[in-house]
């Protein structure tokens, strides 16, 4: 199973090339990414100053969960006034780049992960709140169920990151739950989706990966905890995938990787659905071509009309 990259490869390669070039040139390119995200890379003032802007449907929601503070913490002095029509902008001065090639590469990678970092804030907030609830539960174990109930109602975060799809997450004293709602636009997609999701559920039975997050999925109706959220779609073409993350999954050492893996789940799922359909269509076309060859070989030879030199038809006696 393939894993999609967390960063935007086009932005990474473009910035890497510009950081190493001695002769900067003008840029004005619009780059699209998964989930309807749009980037605008331009040099509006000078060739040595690159402006990278991001437009994201759910950005106003994410600001409520601390995204702007997180982005300022990550990008620091590179944060710039947002370009008109975009939500967030970064300005890079090629004359004030880091000294070493390694630092330049890290900067290019960090900027190419802008979409990932924008979506990371709710996860950091949920992990921080979970730690607070865990401390309170250790002091008063009998009150843990009440703490979880309050957290589910007060700390539940919904991210409407696509037109009809939503990410919902909330902390409890011993876990963080993440729910993806996803739409299967075709009946074939729904069938393939069930197969893939069942593999996620069954995978934990293998001894080597029994410590993986628990995965649950359902169709038509969302889980009880999120049924009252405004904007949650439901129906025969909707599925709901739930990840249950325990403390061992988001320790300080692997927290960033956990966030990255969870974020790309939806796109990875649909990528593999489309790849599977393409593979089956390819195999079907090959099988049809093989059948056509067999039929062509089985055709009887057409007996041609023979004529004499004078033009009369020649009939075999």
Swiss-Prot record:
InterPro entries: ARPC2, ARPC2/4. Coiled coil: none annotated. It is found in: Cytoplasm, Cytoskeleton, Actin patch. It comes from the Eukaryota. The keyword Transmembrane does not apply. GO terms for molecular function: actin filament binding; structural constituent of cytoskeleton. Keywords: Actin-binding, Cytoplasm, Cytoskeleton. One of its GO terms (cellular component) is Arp2/3 protein complex. GO terms for biological process: actin cortical patch assembly; actin filament branching; actin filament polymerization; Arp2/3 complex-mediated actin nucleation; endocytosis. Belongs to the ARPC2 family. Functions as actin-binding component of the Arp2/3 complex which is involved in regulation of actin polymerization and together with an activating nucleation-promoting factor (NPF) mediates the formation of branched actin networks. Seems to contact the mother actin filament. Component of the Arp2/3 complex composed of arp2, act2, arc1/p41-ARC, arc2/p34-ARC, arc3/p21-ARC, arc4/p20-ARC and arc5/p16-ARC. This is Actin-related protein 2/3 complex subunit 2. It comes from Schizosaccharomyces pombe (strain 972 / ATCC 24843).
